[in-house]
Each structure stands twice: as C-alpha cells, then as structure tokens.
Amino acid sequence: MVKVGKWIARHRILMLLIGVLLIIPSVIGIAKTKVNYDLLSYLPDHLETVKGQDILVDEFGMGAFSMVAVENMDMKDVQKLEKEFEKVPHVQDVLWYDDVADISLPTEMIPKDIRKAFINGDATMMLVLFDDTTSSDNSMEALTQLRKIANKQCFISGMTGIVTDIKNIAMKELPIYVVIAALLSLVVLEITSGSFVVPFLFLLSIGLAILYNLGSNIILGETSYITQALTAVLQLGVTMDYSIFLLNSYEENKKRFPGEKERAMGHAIANTFKSVVGSSVTTVAGFIALCVMTFALGRDLGIVMAKGVVIGVICCVTILPALILVFDKPIEKTRHKLLLSNMDRPSAFITKHYKVWIVAFLVLLLPAIYGNNHTKIYYNIADSLPATLNSNVSIKKVKDDFGTSNMHIVMMDKNMSAKDKQQMFKKIDKVKGVKWTISMSSLIGPSVPDSMIPKDVRRVRIMNWHSSVRNMNPQQIR
C-alpha cells in the first residue's frame, strides 16, 4: 500500500485532473436522477393501501384526491370554479353536490347525506380527483395549477398538497442547510487545525465526494427526497474523520522523513487506508443493514450512504493527498497556534476520576430510558411542517368548516349485494373517528336499478368495483 501511496503522491496533478473531470458526469447524473416524493412507492406491494391505490389508478383512472373548502361564495360562482378546475390537466374529475342535486334547490331540500358532506353554513366542499398517484409529478403540477386558479376563499387540502409543499421546501432549503453545515464544520476545523488553508481543502475534498455520490445515484434511477435531503450532511459528518486522520499521519511522517514530502504522504496514505478501512467497513455495514427494512425507503438511504462512505474513503486517499501536496506552501504560510492546543488537563481529569464518570452516566441512563419510553411518536407528516404552509392552513380550514381533515375511498366488489353493503356501511359508521359515509346506495337508495342512475352519479362506478367515500377525523382515532 505504501507503493500505491507514493505513486498517488508523485502523480498528484493527475489525481486532481481526474477529480475535476469526474465533476462533469456527476453533474449530469444529478440532473438525470429523479427525486421521488411518493412514500407509498416504498411500501410492499402486498399491503392493502398499495393494492387499493393500484386499483384506483388502473380501473378508476385516478390515484389521488384533494378536498377543497370554499367559503362565502355564491353557488353559481362555485359551479364556475368547478368547471375551471375540471379543465386543469391531470384532473380526472371534480365532485360537488351539483352532480346529484340542482344548485337551485333550497339547502333544506337537499338530501341529508349530501348536505352533511358538501355544505356547512357559508362553506361548501368539492372533491378534486387526479388521474395519477398522490405524489406523482402530474398530480403535484395539477395541484399547483389549482392553487393559481383558486382565490383567497378557496382552501385545497390533501396529501398531494402536503407533498407539493414538502418538495418546494426541500428545493429551497437544501442548499441553505448544506452551506450552514459546511460553515459550522469550517469553524470547528479552523479552531482545531494548525493552518487556515487546511479546512478549506478538507471541505473541497469531501464536497467532491458528495458530488460524485449524488451523481452516481443515476444507477438507481431515482432516490427519495428524504435521501436527497440527508445525503450531503450525513456524508460530511461521517467522512470528516478520515481527512483529519490523513493530515495527522502526514504531519507525523514529515518528522520521520524530513524534506521528503512525497514519501511522507505515501506512508500517510498507507497508514490512513489501513486504519480507515476498518472503521468505514463497520459504517458501511450499518447503512447496508437499512436495506433489509420492509419499508424500501431504508434500502434507498442505506445504498446511497454506504456508497457515499466508500467514495469518501477513496477521495480521502486520492484527492485530499493531492490537494495537500499542491497547496503545501500556502498551508505552511498560514500556520497558526492551535486554539485548542492542549487537552491534556481535561483528559487527565477524566481518566483520574473515571469511576465518578461511570456512575454519572449510569445515573443519566435512568431518565434517558424514561424519556425514550414516554416520548410520543407522530406519524402525521403534516405535523412536521410549519402551520403557515398552504397545505396546513387548508387542512385547518377544512377541519374548522366540516369537522374533518381526512378522507378515504373504499372499493367494493361490484357483485356485492346491496344488503351486505348496507351492513358494512353501518358498521363503518360506528367506528370511532368516522364522521360520515357516502356511497351510491346512500345517495339514490339501494333499490334503484343501474339504468336509472344519473350519468353524473354513475361515473363513480366503474368496471368491477364500486367506490365509497369515508370522511374521518384522525385525531379521534387512537
């Protein structure tokens, strides 16, 4: 390994040239790697949720829907808004109470089930159906267009709106927190290193490694937005130690081989590789362990981060040594006294009183266990987003106006008898958290023949399945 290290040291310009050239395919790879915002796509195919979504897309031609609350608007204007929504690409349909009742009818004459679902005082609700899945690009583009059409009296809620806001936040804030992480690392390195130039070389080397890792994601075809958001910061934190180890080894070998910097770097590369391989293998193994998760998001993150660690090690023993040798003179000229030059006294104190420290950490273990067992875990992704976001404002408005913030579509076999359907509906209505249920039979009665069902009502009944809507208040479900 020493021979390889010496070869890298001698051909440092070649190493840097290769490193610069690799930026080109990396940038192309990043541009062509799709970012997946659909968490459902990472669920196993055998789950009912996934099966249901596939049926919705394949047989009903829809996979996502949004609830739209409209306040203080004349019914004719709401109807015009409905028609505008229907013209938006990838909007499969818009359901409102005018599909089953004339808007000229007094509110009191509208069937109770329809009135309860679509009208509450000065507020009314529409259901917008998309022709693609919840987090698809098509659905998010359609929702963005709906928001542009809607005025201040309209509030569009639903998972597609949440995902759209997450996408916008991620694209806006990702560069910001990566820069913050880099600046914080730079401050720490400036305090702990002996040269003002070295920290910049560390960040440049790791930055290239991150770029290569993100570019190589093209082999996966796509990565989740969570993986994309975490990769840069995680890789920076995980691989920084490798760079520090190389520099320390180089400084020691310079004393061992005075005036022979290439030889010193060759030995430093060999020593670093031998030491880093062990720690990096355990790190890679930890990330690979994520790949066994049934939830495939773990595999996505595990592969990308394991790949990032390997690339980080390679850059640490190729790109970084070349940078240090090329910028050797600036490094020497900008040397300064270590701000944290002597840690002997704190380490001696800890070593001398090790029993006290053991007892202290054992005592701290008790509140840690208690805190872990009593920390509530939330699964509503909207709770992690700012309350001022369009999606959360709309969710709150729908909840305030209609007492609910969540809706589900239940699909039944077309050949299911009316009696069985009614029995099932009654049981579902009794479930805690279910606010109301609307189905074909609840709108027109179970005894009405198919031939007499109005076209606008019949369109929600397709092929081998019937659809039924359940409106729920998730906060009532425990």
What spans do the regions from the language model cover?
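Structured non-transmembrane domains adjacent to transmembrane bundles in polytopic membrane proteins
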Residues: 45-65, 70-163, 386-478
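Membrane-embedded transmembrane helical bundles of large multi-pass transporters/channels
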Residues: 1-35, 41, 91, 134-379
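Membrane-proximal, lumen/periplasm-facing interface regions of secretory-pathway glyco-
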Residues: 37-45, 379-388
